[in-house]
Amino acid sequence: NGFRPTSEIISFFSELAIPELQGLVDDLIANQTPTGLATFFSGLLSLEGEQKEMALTVLLAQARITDLPLFNLILELEKQYPGDIGLFAPLMLNVITLQPGDAMFLDADTPHAYLKGTGLEIMANSDNVLRA
């Protein structure tokens, strides 16, 4: 769970060849450490304006001509979240489908998202939870 192997992330983004992301990809290639990955992830999610629009345009164009489950997921998410830079997340994070009765454990500080279905999350108290 969490992030895909860095080599896989580099492969996805290198194949997309998005000019607006090339600097981030080059930096990740040069620094394939958790810090390098965090810098890549935050840099990508911080894109704004024309850079963001151009990067998403290339991603969605590729998704429309690539018949792979991962790109089909990106197109499905785009219907719900048009223009969201998070559409790149499936290329960086492992996509896991749980069946009824399945469970998984996530270490602290592991990025994750629930895309559809119903789930129960059990966690300890933390300082980033609002209680009423």
Segments (PLM) and residue ranges:
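Generic, ordered loop/turn and secondary-structure boundary motif
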Residues: 4, 92-94, 115, 130-131
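Short helix-capping and hinge/turn segments at secondary-structure transitions, especially at repeat
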Residues: 79, 106-109, 127-128
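Active-site microenvironments in enzyme catalytic cores
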Residues: 1-13
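Long, charge-rich alpha-helical interaction segments
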Residues: 13-80
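Conserved metal-binding segment of the jelly-roll/cupin
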Residues: 1, 97-115
